Structure formats: structure tokens, C-alpha cells
């Protein structure tokens, strides 16, 4: 954890969803709220997204959007996810890029600087590693002029920070929508997670949708996951 920005008038929280799922890409969200309004998130029932089912998540989305000052969500499909991982050579560098991107958009939309905000992230890397990842990004891309480093890195942050919890719910809602769109497009009920039913679903795509090429699978699943990569080797 870094030092809190005690003079900040605004709080920002960010989290991602889909990171551990074999199918689909990933969604990253950040929310901005005035420090004096943080109790509103408690009043509307914001909590750890893992405690809510999909229906409850969807019901909370409009309430959160109405309660916060602003929010940004990036829904990255599987094809783009795989391209980014290949480009950045490291999943955590890619995650750093996506979190920095939602911070950048949120600050830009509201004409704020990072110094005016107290920023919290659900920790996927500690501050030292996150800083190293931003240094790698500086040499890899020029899209973001400023790479913001959060003030707080919280393990299971959605359990301790309402602003992270709100971002977590928005990210999960976006990932749910992404998975529902995939299922509708391909006529296959894609399993969640990265263990149960994954190989069976990959086989189903082969038999039901005539998937025979790596590029076809890369549009629906994370090709670097071990069980997916093992299956894809059989296509060669």
C-alpha cells in the first residue's frame, strides 16, 4: 500500500472480471465518486460481488451508475485479450495497461488529475510490481501519456473498499454480458471458471460449430490457459 491522498476530494476504485475464466476475454471497470458520497454505495447494497448471483449483479448496475460521479468499463473480447497478451508478453502487464487505461479515461472525462483522487485497486500485483509493469508499458506503447499508480493495493479489495466493490460489480456485469453474447452467437453454453466442463465445451465447438482452426478458438477462449493450450495442440 502507498500513502493515502488525504487531500483528495474524489475516490476511484478499479477491479477486473474474467481473469480466471477460460472462455471469454476480460472486463475492467473503474468508478469515481465524491468522498462525501461514499456511504451511498453502502445504502444501495454494494458489497463483495462474489456474494451476488448474476441477477443481483445486473440489478445493482443501474443503482451504482446513478450513485457514482462517473464510471468507465472496458470489455475486452477473447480475440483482443489474446492479442494483448501476445503483444505485452505478460498477463499482469496487460492488466496494468487496462487499469491505467480506465483511470486515464475517467480522469480525462472529468478533467481531473490523479493527484486530486485517492485511488484503490483490487490487488493483482503489489505496488513494486505494478510500478515495474508501468515501466515496461512505457517502452511498449504510447497510447497512454500518463500511467497512474494507485494509492492503495488491497488484497480482496472488494471486501474492504466500497469503491472497489462497485467497480467489481460493474466489471462482472460486463463480463456476464460478454459471455451471454458468446453463448447466443455460437449456440453453446460456455462454462465459467477454468476447470469443470472446459474441454467438453471445446470439443462441442469442434463437433457442433466445426471449429478446426486456432483462430476460431482464439475468438472465444484464452489460448494461453493450460487446458485450452493442451487441447489446441491437437489441432496441429
From Swiss-Prot:
Pfam families: RNase_HII (PF01351). It is found in: Cytoplasm. A divalent metal cation binds at residues 15-16, 122. GO terms for molecular function: metal ion binding; RNA binding; RNA-DNA hybrid ribonuclease activity. Keywords: Cytoplasm, Endonuclease, Hydrolase, Metal-binding, Nuclease. Its cofactor is a divalent metal cation. Its EC number is 3.1.26.4. It catalyses: Endonucleolytic cleavage to 5'-phosphomonoester. One of its GO terms (biological process) is DNA replication, removal of RNA primer. Manganese or magnesium. Binds 1 divalent metal ion per monomer in the absence of substrate. May bind a second metal ion after substrate binding. One of its GO terms (cellular component) is cytoplasm. Signal peptide: none annotated. CDD domains: RNase_HII_bacteria_HIII_like (cd06590). Residues 9-236 form the RNase H type-2 domain. It comes from the Bacteria. Endonuclease that specifically degrades the RNA of RNA-DNA hybrids. PANTHER family: RIBONUCLEASE (PTHR10954:SF23), RIBONUCLEASE H2 SUBUNIT A (PTHR10954). Belongs to the RNase HII family. RnhC subfamily. This is Ribonuclease HIII. The lineage of its organism: Bacteria, Bacillati, Mycoplasmatota, Mycoplasmoidales, Mycoplasmoidaceae. The gene is rnhC.
Amino acid at each position: 500500500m502507498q500513502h493515502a491522498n488525504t487531500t483528495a476530494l474524489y475516490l476511484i476504485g478499479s477491479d477486473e472480471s474474467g481473469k480466471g475464466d477460460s472462455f471469454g476475454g476480460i472486463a475492467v471497470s473503474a468508478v469515481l465518486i465524491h468522498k462525501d458520497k461514499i456511504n451511498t454505495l453502502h445504502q444501495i447494497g454494494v458489497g463483495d460481488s462474489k456474494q451476488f448471483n448474476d441477477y443481483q449483479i445486473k440489478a445493482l448496475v443501474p443503482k451504482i451508475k446513478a450513485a457514482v460521479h462517473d464510471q468507465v468499463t472496458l470489455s475486452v473480447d477473447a480475440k483482443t485479450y489474446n492479442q494483448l497478451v501476445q503483444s505485452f508478453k505478460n498477463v499482469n502487464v496487460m492488466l496494468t495497461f487496462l487499469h491505467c487505461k480506465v483511470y486515464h479515461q475517467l480522469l480525462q472525462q472529468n478533467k481531473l488529475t490523479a493527484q486530486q483522487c485517492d485511488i484503490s485497486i483490487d490487488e493483482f500485483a503489489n505496488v513494486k510490481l505494478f510500478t515495474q509493469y508501468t515501466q515496461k508499458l512505457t517502452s511498449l506503447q504510447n497510447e497512454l501519456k500518463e500511467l497512474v499508480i494507485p494509492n492503495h493495493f488491497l488484497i480482496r479489495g472488494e471486501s474492504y473498499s466500497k469503491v472497489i466493490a462497485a467497480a467489481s460489480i460493474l466489471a462482472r456485469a460486463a463480463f456476464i454480458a460478454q459471455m451471454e453474447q458468446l453463448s447466443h452467437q455460437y449456440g453453446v453454453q460456455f462454462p465459467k471458471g477454468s476447470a469443470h466442463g472446459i474441454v467438453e465445451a471445446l470439443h462441442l465447438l469442434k463437433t457442433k460449430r466445426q471449429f478446426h482452426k486456432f483462430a476460431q478458438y482464439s475468438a472465444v477462449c484464452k489460448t494461453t490457459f493450460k487446458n485450452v493450450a493442451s487441447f489446441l495442440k491437437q489441432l496441429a
